[in-house]
UniProtKB/Swiss-Prot annotation:
Entry's Gene Ontology cellular component terms: cytoplasm; cytoskeleton; nucleus
Function: Interacts with MAPK kinases and regulates activation of MAP kinases. Does not display kinase activity.
GO biological-process terms attached to the record: negative regulation of fat cell differentiation; negative regulation of interleukin-10 production; positive regulation of proteasomal ubiquitin-dependent protein catabolic process; regulation of MAP kinase activity
Record's protein name: Tribbles homolog 2
Entries under InterPro entries matching the protein: Kinase-like_dom_sf, Prot_kinase_dom, Tribbles/Ser_Thr_kinase_40
């Protein structure tokens, strides 16, 4: 597997070449460490437990401490031993980490996409370190009920910028949703795409896909309607529209507790936009949530929309200020994958 990246990253390997660093261009030649070497002198096993539990031992991985699990049994809170910097560590099987991270390796860096800071290779596991985050967009919108247009415009521009960069770099994200975007700062003014692990690497200019990958609330009509292929980029754009609507309105544009009823509403592509939104915001939503994929804006065209250049300080500041009274963003109801509905 050939992996290329325009900028290098630190990769440490344990064994004879302990602390050796390699660029992404050399990833294809990396193998597991020598079995005689041990990671941790005194702090327990370097490998996280198979299932998270309260008895998880603190583990020492190179210059990092792995603390409690954050998600499942493969994502952990980590701390740099010397600086005290907090990070996130994702643990992969050594045999498949290159495939899992391939989209990261083939895409150039972007300020709104989570970057790998270091990879440490063990005998059976690869430990991949990312900068920490300060919560996700789904939880933020749910807490706020909905966002004022000025705040939504600032955050959504960053979201669309990350997606446009992926599309320009030959990636289709497939499973876009608010939860995939996390905050870079405690003030919650800067966001980034949490991971690219679900992304599909395009071979050339053709972005046709045929899988049913995605989240029910965010899935596009053509994915539900067709048994053949569809435009992956256009499907991503539809998901962006669902995200924008949810940020501004406080509920999904299409919602129902029954999946079959939800999918029927999505297929029809009919939704209501509150009159409290500004004309430019309504225009952008309607330009994205088009039932016909070819009629939607591209991710790059979204960035050029005049809504983002609105001077909100002199425009009608009342837009988006009315409280939401029903259909708040659910905590988990429609956050499951599509797969069970098509098996």
């Amino acid at each position: 597997m050939n992996i290329h990246r325009s900028t290098p990253i630190t990769i440490a390997r344990y064994g004879r070449s302990r602390n050796k660093t390699q660029d992404f261009e050399e990833l294809s030649s990396i193998r597991s460490a020598e079995p005689s070497q041990s990671f941790s002198p005194n702090l327990g096993s370097p490998s996280p437990p198979e299932t998270p539990n309260l008895s998880h031992c603190v583990s020492c991985i190179g210059k990092y401490l792995l603390l409690e699990p954050l998600e499942g049994d493969h994502v952990f809170r980590a701390v740099h031993l010397h600086s005290g910097e907090e990070l996130v560590c994702k643990v992969f099987d050594i045999s498949c980490y290159q495939e899992s991270l391939a989209p990261c390796f083939c895409l150039s860096a972007h300020s709104n996409i989570n970057q790998i800071t270091e990879i440490i290779l063990g005998e059976t596991k690869a430990y991949v370190f990312f900068e920490r985050s300060y919560g996700d967009m789904h939880s933020f919108v749910r807490t706020c009920k909905k966002l004022r247009e000025e705040e939504a415009a600032r955050l959504f521009y960053q979201i669309a910028s990350a997606v446009a960069h992926c599309h320009d770099g030959g990636l289709v994200l497939r499973d876009l949703k608010l939860r995939k975007f996390i905050f870079k700062d405690e003030e919650r003014t800067r966001v980034k795409l949490e991971s690219l692990e679900d992304a599909y690497i395009l071979r050339g200019d053709d972005d046709s896909l045929s899988d049913k990958h995605g989240c029910p609330a965010y899935v596009s009509p053509e994915i539900l309607n067709t048994s053949g292929s569809y435009s992956g980029k256009a499907a991503d754009v539809w998901s962006l529209g669902v995200m924008l609507y949810t940020m501004l309105v406080g509920r999904y544009p299409f919602h129902d507790i029954e999946p079959s009823s939800l999918f029927s509403k999505i297929r029809r592509g009919q939704f209501n936009i509150p009159e409290t939104l500004s004309p430019k915001a309504k225009c952008l939503i309607r330009s994205i949530l088009r039932r016909e994929p070819s009629e939607r804006l591209t991710s790059q065209e979204i960035l050029d929309h005049p809504w983002f250049s609105t001077d909100f300080s002199v425009s009608n500041s009342g837009y988006g200020a009315k409280e939401v009274s029903d259909q708040l963003v659910p905590d988990v109801n429609m956050e499951e994958n599509l797969d069970p509905f098509f098996n």
